[in-house]
Amino acid sequence: MPPSINEPNLQEMFDSLAPKYDRINSILSLGMHHLWNRTFARMLGKSEHLLDLCSGTGKVAYRYIRDYPGSKATLVDFSEKMLLAAQQRYPDAPFTFIEGDIVQLPIDEESQTLASMSYGLRNLSNPKQALEEIHRILQHNGCLGILELTSPSRKHPLYLAHRLYLNFLVPWLGRLCSKNKQAYTYLAESIKKLPSDDYLEQLFQNAKFQVSKKRKLAFGSATIWILKKI
């Protein structure tokens, strides 16, 4: 399946970054993503099964099953090596794995109660189509949780510092840590290019989702939305 992403080589990039992906998230989030993942899991609420989209190496899914013992998760990602990293890291976790595209999920209609997407929304070339596909597979009143790296408001005192961090420090750290400045530059740019909350929330509404909960983290450096299918 062709990946629903906004760069033709992004699948290869994420494959190459899989061994270092958690370090990348630490850099992009200033080390706060562990706390954010925990907050996200708690806001998702208890369910027997979580469909974790754009799952990466499985840290969010693992956080979820730790917080809700007895639950299981299906991890979906277009990167084979990300899923392989998750299998190797959590060999005993109650996970199943699907390698594929979020806009064409091999999942029955209205078969899921809870889905999540962490740090993946900004990499989608067609978020409208992805949201429509997620809507298709969720049951009535099912929920989709989104955790994404965002930017503080332009009026916020830390806006400029956040921009300087993304523009200069993140690429430098990328070159230092992985010798892949281009990948880190892309990831930093993807945060800056993410549309406004108003735009995204209109997109959610157009896809027949209602925002039931929203939380800004670290002065707006990350945002959690809990969406309900309507």
UniProtKB/Swiss-Prot annotation:
The keyword Ligase does not apply. Keywords: Menaquinone biosynthesis, Methyltransferase, S-adenosyl-L-methionine, Transferase. InterPro entries: SAM-dependent_MTases_sf, UbiE/COQ5_MeTrFase, UbiE/COQ5_MeTrFase_CS. Pathway: Quinol/quinone metabolism; menaquinone biosynthesis; menaquinol from 1,4-dihydroxy-2-naphthoate: step 2/2. Transmembrane segments: none annotated. It catalyses: a 2-demethylmenaquinol + S-adenosyl-L-methionine = a menaquinol + S-adenosyl-L-homocysteine + H(+). Its EC number is 2.1.1.163. S-adenosyl-L-methionine binds at residues 57, 77, 101-102, 118. PANTHER family: 2-METHOXY-6-POLYPRENYL-1,4-BENZOQUINOL METHYLASE, MITOCHONDRIAL (PTHR43591:SF24), METHYLTRANSFERASE (PTHR43591). This is Demethylmenaquinone methyltransferase. Methyltransferase required for the conversion of demethylmenaquinol (DMKH2) to menaquinol (MKH2). Belongs to the class I-like SAM-binding methyltransferase superfamily. MenG/UbiE family. It comes from the Bacteria. The gene is menG. One of its GO terms (molecular function) is demethylmenaquinone methyltransferase activity. The keyword Ribonucleoprotein does not apply. GO terms for biological process: menaquinone biosynthetic process; methylation.
